[in-house]
Regions:
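Axial heme c-ligation environment in periplasmic c-type cytochrome domains
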Residues: 66-72, 93-147
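Electrostatic cytochrome c docking/interface patches
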Residues: 21-48
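Stable alpha-helical elements in mature extracytoplasmic
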Residues: 41, 80, 84, 116-117, ...
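Periplasmic/extracellular electron-transfer cofactor-ligation site
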Residues: 40, 46-72, 79-82, 91-99, ...
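C-terminal motif of bacterial Sec signal peptides marking the signal peptidase cleavage site
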Residues: 14-16
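Sec-dependent signal peptide recognition
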Residues: 2-8
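Acidic, carboxylate-rich catalytic segments that either coordinate divalent cations
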Residues: 8, 19-21
């Protein structure tokens, strides 16, 4: 009887220890998936940026004098990703302050999908020295539902 109990406890401990390794491997593979998604979003986001954004914000993300704000090193962008998602999708006609400079040029909304918003935010959030990391489409979905007019 004691042997059966000991074998049962040993088996339970063996499976409990083994599941920790599986979770560790699963977590590492999720990180790998996120790294792959980050790279994919950056590549696709660069295409979206070139099509819809670069004309005003320039290829180097430095903006255009006092007309269009920079995205490179932009405090507003990095501190307000949810608001940036809303601006990209819906446009903006209000005044905006970026790196201490006030801009009052209207920005039209863009006819792009929520996935493309996530991709372009990932691209500009990690280009030109910015370090925002991966912007997921689920985050963008949530942010766009909460946009203020």
């Amino acid at each position: 009887m004691k042997n059966k109990v000991l074998i049962g406890i040993f088996t339970l401990l063996l499976f409990a220890c083994g599941s920790g390794e599986e979770k560790k491997e699963e977590k590492e593979s999720m990180n790998s998936r996120d790294e792959i998604r980050l790279k994919q979003y950056q590549v696709q986001g660069a295409k979206v940026y070139a099509t819809y954004c670069a004309n005003c914000h320039q290829q180097d993300g430095k903006g255009l004098a006092s007309l269009y704000p920079p995205l490179a090193g932009a405090d507003y962008l990095l501190e307000n990703l949810p608001r940036a998602a809303c601006i990209i999708k819906n446009g903006q006609s209000k005044e905006i302050v970026v790196n201490g400079v006030t801009y009052n040029q209207m920005m039209p909304g863009n006819p792009i999908t929520n996935l493309e918003v996530a991709e372009v935010l990932t691209y500009i959030g990690n280009a030109w020295g910015n370090e925002a990391g991966l912007v997921g489409v689920k985050d963008v979905d949530k942010w766009l539902e909460e946009c203020e007019d």
